[in-house]
Regions:
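Phosphate/nucleotide-binding beta-alpha loop and adjacent structural elements of enzyme active sites
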Residues: 2-289
Length: 289
């Protein structure tokens, strides 16, 4: 990726690094009385790295990434094809149309009540794209889609995710499920004649990995230029890890963590990346100019 503002995550080299390592490996620094300090610094560091800051389009860095990375990658494409998977009521789809006015936007939302609002706001353009009352997974099937209220916000989850949130910070009210049809991205693209996805955006509450597995052919053939996925608390309940995304994508994509005014490259995998706080990631195809 050229020209985007990035921060290198590789450790710096020099005398300060050696001194820091000597200090950190001293047993005295692990003294019980220092633990509250380290806890506060850890919380501050996590916040400063934008972990947990991925919930709102305007402040998460998603808008920045769309304008400064996705638009640049799609700059040589006359009519970019964008998939907004988990479109909800269409806020992100409308943002895409504002910054990529020539894009063909496919907006997918499986929940019928939410889709009704999406359809009012996002219409088809030029006979292609538009809203679809459809979800995606790793196979074609019919599943239960649950709706629940967390802090007043409606969220939908595939039935494989455990809704018993282990937190007392918010009240969780589970509502009746509905049966919905899910498809694979590979099958949908074949049926609809979609040869390439220039930007694939995923926000499906912990089901992102299954959606990507259903797009394996498109990914392996390099027919998805850029993709964005969310990783956070829902992945605890779907039992998926950042390593799963890394294993699936790292061979063909450079992966970045999105921050409010930039993206941070992730050049290698480490256990420290398993942070289950709502965060958005960008994957840019290595074959993408």
């Amino acid at each position: 990726m050229r020209g985007a503002e990035v921060t290198d995550m590789r450790p710096s080299r020099g005398p300060f690094t050696g001194l820091l390592k000597k200090i950190l490996f001293r047993q005295s620094i692990k003294h019980p009385r220092l633990q509250p300090l380290w806890g506060r610094l850890h919380t501050l560091s996590v916040y400063g790295m934008n972990y947990g800051g991925g919930g709102l389009i305007g402040t998460s860095g998603e808008a920045w990434a769309l304008v400064n990375v996705v638009r640049r990658v799609c700059g040589n494409v006359a009519a970019p094809v964008v998939f907004d998977v988990g479109a909800n009521v269409g806020d992100y789809s409308l943002l895409v149309r504002r910054h990529l006015p020539l894009a063909t936007v496919y907006a997918f939302e499986p929940a019928r009540s939410v889709y009704a609002e999406l359809a009012k706001r996002v219409s088809a353009g030029g006979g292609r794209g538009g809203p679809f009352n459809l979800g995606f997974s790793d196979s074609q099937k019919t599943v239960d889609l649950y709706s629940y209220t967390v802090g007043g916000q409606e969220v939908s989850l595939i039935s494989s995710i455990d809704l018993r949130l282990p937190t007392q910070a918010v009240e969780v009210k589970t509502r009746a499920s509905e049966r919905v049809r899910v498809e694979t991205i590979d099958r949908f693209c074949e049926a609809e004649g979609v040869a390439r996805i220039d930007f694939l955006k995923l926000d499906v509450e912990g089901h992102e990995l299954s959606v990507l597995r259903g797009a394996r052919r498109m990914l392996d053939e390099g027919r998805v230029s850029v993709l964005q996925f969310e990783f956070g608390p829902a992945n605890i309940y779907s039992r998926t890890y950042f390593y799963d995304f890394w294993s699936l994508l790292a061979g063909g994509y450079d992966i970045f963590r999105i921050i409010p005014d930039g993206v941070v490259p992730i050049p290698f995998y480490g256990e420290h990346l398993e942070v289950f706080l709502t965060t958005n990631y960008l994957a840019v195809g290595k074959r993408t100019p």
